[in-house]
Amino acid sequence: MALEISRLFPQNIQELPSLSGVRIATAEAGIKYKDRTDLLFIVFDKSASVAGVFTRSKCPSAPVEHCRISLPHGVARGVVVNSGNANAFTGRKGKQTVDTIICAAANALKVKKNEIFIASTGVIGEPMEASSIVNLLPSMAKTAKEGNWLEAAKAIMTTDTFPKLATRRFDCGGETITINGIAKGAGMIAPDMATMLSFVVSDAAISSQMLQSMLSEAVQESFNSITVDSDTSTSDTLMMFATGKESFPCITSKTDPRYEVFSKQLRALLHELALQVVCDGEGARHLIEVHVIGATTDNTAKIIALSIANSPLVKTAIAGEDANWGRVVMAVGKAGVEVDRDLLTIWFGEHRLAINGERDPEYCEEKIGAYMQNKHITIRVDIGLGTGKATVWSCDLTKEYVMINGDYRS
């Protein structure tokens, strides 16, 4: 099914710079899609340190299980990614498929099996044959080339309507460092982690322990703060790799001043990728930004913000460009944390709609109606009980979302 490109499509798709020793190949494996690439092979010519964050679903895919087992080894030489089949809930055969692909990739690169990582995205519960992937890996290992990031982002798309890429180039301790990232995701997007798949590579030298610390911290304000439909995928995978410039001494401690410099840039890059995922939410026509302030703690603020952002009634109101702030009140009330109805204040953009538990006396339907036609809608709620605050991002819920997911397997 051909999908209309999201109206929240970024005006300019970034061109990502090449990273020395990072080679990329894509291919058409015919797993589900015809006449498009659906297989990605990232090759590291030298050992790269690795970190990862994965789904908290209790039904994780076979690729996720493999990555969790291999991650403590701390070294990566290759990543195999396919779209069209999640290889999730596929039992023993799914694990055998992963093992077969891992062995083939390791043989193609002449490296250890625990230095190969794998990710899959697509339909859940359908067995996946390894042969269509395995047969392509030897030639892909030979033809992989530096650059090719746009093609990499395209190869991992499923219901995405545009490829998602971001890059940062900055000074870190007197050395110019680059971070490149790609992501995919449009549906089945909810926190913990979450996007469906994302891969980030830097030429900095960072120990796997510090890389894991940076990634785990950075994900909280990015992929763990977005939601499209409140559904957490079985396959969510965010992995980061650091190849290590020889001229850049390795970061091995949080006390290294470069740790925070790098972390700041990583947070910005992940935030950019996460917003691209939300902007490509299936059928999305509005980006929704939810700010909650005045909660008892930051954690309760985030719970309330997610309750608002995940509410089908709030999301459909935004889709209909209807400032139905009563649905925000409903979402706050059902969050299950401490609130006081008579202290609530609600804004849509700069328009205050409710104050101290009732409609604002200066409420103007005409003014707020004009605001609701914007592509980017901001909802701000003051709980009035403390200093806790949180921000999450979501998108509206449209008829197109139902159509896309109703036809997903056809």
UniProtKB/Swiss-Prot annotation:
A UniProt-annotated Pfam family: ArgJ
UniProt-annotated catalytic positions: 195
Binding site for substrate: 158, 184, 195, 282, 405, 410
Alphabetical UniProt keywords: Acyltransferase, Amino-acid biosynthesis, Arginine biosynthesis, Autocatalytic cleavage, Cytoplasm, Multifunctional enzyme, Transferase
Places the protein is found: Cytoplasm
EC identifiers of the protein: 2.3.1.35, 2.3.1.1
GO cellular component, one term: cytoplasm
Site (Involved in the stabilization of negative charge on the oxyanion by the formation of the oxyanion hole): 121-122
Top-level taxon in the UniProt lineage: Bacteria
InterPro entries named among the record's database cross-references: Arg_biosynth_ArgJ, ArgJ-like_dom_sf, ArgJ_beta_C
Record-marked site positions (Cleavage): 194-195
Pathway(s) annotated for this protein in UniProt: Amino-acid biosynthesis; L-arginine biosynthesis; L-ornithine and N-acetyl-L-glutamate from L-glutamate and N(2)-acetyl-L-ornithine (cyclic): step 1/1; Amino-acid biosynthesis; L-arginine biosynthesis; N(2)-acetyl-L-ornithine from L-glutamate: step 1/4
Main location: cytoplasm
One GO BP annotation of this record: ornithine biosynthetic process
Reactions this protein catalyses: N(2)-acetyl-L-ornithine + L-glutamate = N-acetyl-L-glutamate + L-ornithine; L-glutamate + acetyl-CoA = N-acetyl-L-glutamate + CoA + H(+)
One term of GO molecular function: glutamate N-acetyltransferase activity
Free-text function comment from the UniProt entry: Catalyzes two activities which are involved in the cyclic version of arginine biosynthesis: the synthesis of N-acetylglutamate from glutamate and acetyl-CoA as the acetyl donor, and of ornithine by transacetylation between N(2)-acetylornithine and glutamate.
Oligomeric and partner information: Heterotetramer of two alpha and two beta chains.
Protein family (similarity comment): Belongs to the ArgJ family.
Protein name according to UniProt: Arginine biosynthesis bifunctional protein ArgJ
Gene that encodes the chain: argJ
